[in-house]
């Protein structure tokens, strides 16, 4: 009996060692507060207070060990009101002076025009499991630096939040437009003693956002997060309208020294011989190089105070933010007598005027003439256009051409001596039809798990057929196989195999007609992707006729 008890005890110990050591969150925000203030003189203040308790070494050493605060000292002042750590036993460890490290933001490292930007790295000290970080700081913007009060504040963090408070304080005039997206919590309106108005949201027990939430493009990730319903977002602005907000931005899109622009167009026109299409191609090739990482500085509009350098200055410097490069692109095309304009993409709210400049997620150039051998701009935006606002700089709605709206077909042909036909032992030939890798954007990024906990917005709908024709190698016989078809509410997957004369034709079709996936509809999408990724559906076997 004693021996049995020992065995049982050993088994329990083994089971315990196999169980996860920690099933809770990495950390927890006891309180996260953001207070936006617009003063009568036009200056603004963003005050952030956070109380964050750490539960794991990953949170302590990586995720929350440092806080990064970017600001522009030419127009903004950073004030650290309080920074300390309260250890588990109650001991207070104040952040020492040498733990406030001011550096150049990495995104501005190769851009002398933006080397004035600073990033304050607050290195939290005295950390241990169970410790709580307290940080309270303000970024104060000088009058005139920002055109209006503009708020775009995602709520959910990677860790749960016990209490989230967002307050917006302004003069009673101009009117404040505001909205909380994807969360049912009314705003509390308050009048302060000094004849000002406050709007405040208090959200409790906010669940964390998924750690590996799938999005396709950094610039459009907020669209996918918000439009899916996963991410609550507070938007607010004192601009009288969205069109008025764009008017202030439109004033930044200027050519500057037009002689510099025309000189560049003349240089690019060499070899075009007066051919309009060749000139468009030359401009497209030049801008493709500029849009690459070599010339594109990953600063957002808000990082530069919604200000742009003139196109001529961007041309001379050889680099620019995305918005600056778009301005240069359009200026070059217009100087060459080509048609081009600027397209603005922003978050969609229930009322257009609730969104200001901070809600802009993408800016790109739309051309009347397509450049050859150059990626078409705005394709990712076109795939998501029903989930965001798309306008020109005057606020007029813009409809983008969507390349996935119609059924597309791609054809491949393998000759009998094609190097892609592998020879196996016994003279057996193996061929892999095309198509599987063409939908990696969906199958690899959005079908990693068998289920999801939060809604997911796919980057596109999809309808594409891939036809591979394989010429029969001489003296070989095709090993017949049956077709496959799955049809459900999300779309369909079809594989057919036909023999005609001296060839085998493999037809693979993938249709995904449901872009917004919920936890209940996701299994249908996963079933399609699982079938589409099955290697066996693409393989053809040929055996020697003598076998």
Regions found by a protein language model. Give the residues of each.
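Positively charged n-region of N-terminal signal peptides that target proteins for export
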Residues: 1-4
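Bacterial N-terminal signal peptides
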Residues: 9-18
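A sensor for short, sequence-defined functional sites
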Residues: 23-547
């Amino acid at each position: 009996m004693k021996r049995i008890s020992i065995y049982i005890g050993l088994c329990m110990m083994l089971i315990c060692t196999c169980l996860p050591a920690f099933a809770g969150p990495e950390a927890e925000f006891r309180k996260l507060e953001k207070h936006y203030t617009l003063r009568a003189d036009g200056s603004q203040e963003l005050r952030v207070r956070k109380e964050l308790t750490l539960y794991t070494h990953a949170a302590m050493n990586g995720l929350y060990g440092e806080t990064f605060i970017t600001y522009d000292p030419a127009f903004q002042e950073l004030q650290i009101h309080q920074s300390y750590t309260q250890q588990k036993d109650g001991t207070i460890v104040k952040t020492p002076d040498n733990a406030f490290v001011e550096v150049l933001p990495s995104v501005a490292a190769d851009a002398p025009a933006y080397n004035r930007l600073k990033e304050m790295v607050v290195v939290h000290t005295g950390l241990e499991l169970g410790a709580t970080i307290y940080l309270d700081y303000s970024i104060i913007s000088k009058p005139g630096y920002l055109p209006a009060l503009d708020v775009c504040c995602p709520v959910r963090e990677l860790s749960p939040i016990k209490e989230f408070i967002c307050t917006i304080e302004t003069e009673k005039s101009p009117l404040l437009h505001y909205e909380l997206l994807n969360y049912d919590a009314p705003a509390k309106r308050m009048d302060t003693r000094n004849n000002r108005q406050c709007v405040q949201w208090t959200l409790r027990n906010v669940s964390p956002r998924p750690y590996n939430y799938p999005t396709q493009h950094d610039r459009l990730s907020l669209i996918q997060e918000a439009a899916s319903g996963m991410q609550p977002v507070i938007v607010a602005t004192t601009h009288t309208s969205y069109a008025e907000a764009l008017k202030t931005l439109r004033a930044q899109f200027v050519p500057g020294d037009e002689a510099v622009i025309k000189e560049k167009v003349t240089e690019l026109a060499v070899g075009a011989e007066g051919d309009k299409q060749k000139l468009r191609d030359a401009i497209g090739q030049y801008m493709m190089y500029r849009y690459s990482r070599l010339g594109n500085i990953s600063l957002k509009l808000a990082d530069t105070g919604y200000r742009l350098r003139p196109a001529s200055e961007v041309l001379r410097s050889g680099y620019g933010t995305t918005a600056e490069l778009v301005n240069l692109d359009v200026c070059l095309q217009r100087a060459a007598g080509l048609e081009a304009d600027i397209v603005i993409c922003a978050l969609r709210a229930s009322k257009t005027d609730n969104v200001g400049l901070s809600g802009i997620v993408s800016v790109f150039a739309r051309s009347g003439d397509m450049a050859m051998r150059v990626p078409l701009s705005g394709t990712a935006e076109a795939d998501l256009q029903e989930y965001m606002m798309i306008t020109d700089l005057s606020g007029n709605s813009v409809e983008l051409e969507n390349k996935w709206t119609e059924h597309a077909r791609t054809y491949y042909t393998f000759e009998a001596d094609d190097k892609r036909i592998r020879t196996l032992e016994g003279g057996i030939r193996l061929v892999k039809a095309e198509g599987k890798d063409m939908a990696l954007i969906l199958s690899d990024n959005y079908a990693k798990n068998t289920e999801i906990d939060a809604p997911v917005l796919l980057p596109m709908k999809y309808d594409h057929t891939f036809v591979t024709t394989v010429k029969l190698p001489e003296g070989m016989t095709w090993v017949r196989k049956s077709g496959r078809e799955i049809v459900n509410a999300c779309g369909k997957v079809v594989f057919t195999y036909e023999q005609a004369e001296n060839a085998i034709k493999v037809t693979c079709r993938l249709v995904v007609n449901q872009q917004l996936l919920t936890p209940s509809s996701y299994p249908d999408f996963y079933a399609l992707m699982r079938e589409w990724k099955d290697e066996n559906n693409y393989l053809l076997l040929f055996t020697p006729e003598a076998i």
